[in-house]
Swiss-Prot record:
A Gene Ontology molecular function term of the record: phospholipid transfer activity
Lineage: Bacteria, Pseudomonadati, Pseudomonadota, Gammaproteobacteria, Pasteurellales
Record's subcellular location: Cytoplasm
PANTHER family: BLR2341 PROTEIN, INTERMEMBRANE PHOSPHOLIPID TRANSPORT SYSTEM BINDING PROTEIN MLAB
STAS domain residues: 4-105
Species assigned in the record: Haemophilus influenzae (strain ATCC 51907 / DSM 11121 / KW20 / Rd)
Role of this protein: Part of the ABC transporter complex MlaFEDB, which is involved in a phospholipid transport pathway that maintains lipid asymmetry in the outer membrane by retrograde trafficking of phospholipids from the outer membrane to the inner membrane. MlaB plays critical roles in both the assembly and activity of the complex. May act by modulating MlaF structure and stability.
InterPro entries for this protein: MlaB_ABC_Transporter (IPR052746), STAS_dom (IPR002645), STAS_dom_sf (IPR036513)
Protein's recorded name: Intermembrane phospholipid transport system binding protein MlaB
UniProt cross-references to CDD domains, sorted A to Z: STAS_anti-anti-sigma_factors (cd07043)
Chain's gene name: mlaB
GO biological process: DNA damage response; intermembrane phospholipid transfer
SUPFAM superfamilies named in the record: SpoIIaa-like
Pfam family, one: STAS
Chief subcellular location: cytoplasm
Oligomer status and interactors: The complex is composed of two ATP-binding proteins (MlaF), two transmembrane proteins (MlaE), two cytoplasmic solute-binding proteins (MlaB) and six periplasmic solute-binding proteins (MlaD).
C-alpha cells in the first residue's frame, strides 16, 4: 500500500510518501500526479520529498520517483530528497544514476 501527503510551510512544500512505492502500488499515485505536481500546487521555492516512512521501493517505483523529481525541476524548483532509503540509493547505483540522485540529497 502507498499513501502520500502534502504539507506547505513558508517557502517549502513537503511531499511525504508512506508505505511501498512499487509496481503493484504505483498506479493510483501515478494517476494523481497532476494533483501534487501542478504549478499551482508547487507554488513554493523548495520541494522536499520526505521518504522516511517509505518501507520499500522497486525499480518501477524508482523510475516514477525519478520522473516526479524531473517534473519538479522543470518547474524551476529546488528539489530535495529527505531520508532516502538504502534501496533507492542501491537502485540509483544499479541504473547509473547515483550522481544525478546525489544532487537531491
Amino acid at each position: 500500500m502507498l499513501n502520500w501527503d502534502l504539507q506547505k510551510n513558508n517557502d517549502k512544500i513537503t511531499l511525504f510518501l508512506f508505505g511501498e512505492l512499487s509496481r503493484s502500488t504505483l498506479l493510483p499515485m501515478w494517476q494523481q500526479r497532476g494533483v501534487f505536481l501542478s504549478a499551482s500546487t508547487l507554488d513554493k521555492t523548495i520541494v522536499e520529498w520526505n521518504l522516511s516512512d517509505l518501507q520499500h521501493i522497486d525499480s518501477a517505483g524508482f523510475a516514477a520517483l525519478c520522473d516526479f523529481l524531473r517534473e519538479c525541476q522543470k518547474l524551476n524548483k529546488t528539489v530535495r530528497l529527505v531520508y532516502p532509503p538504502k534501496q533507492l540509493l542501491t537502485l540509483a547505483d544499479l541504473f547509473g544514476l547515483s550522481d544525478w540522485i546525489a544532487n537531491f540529497i
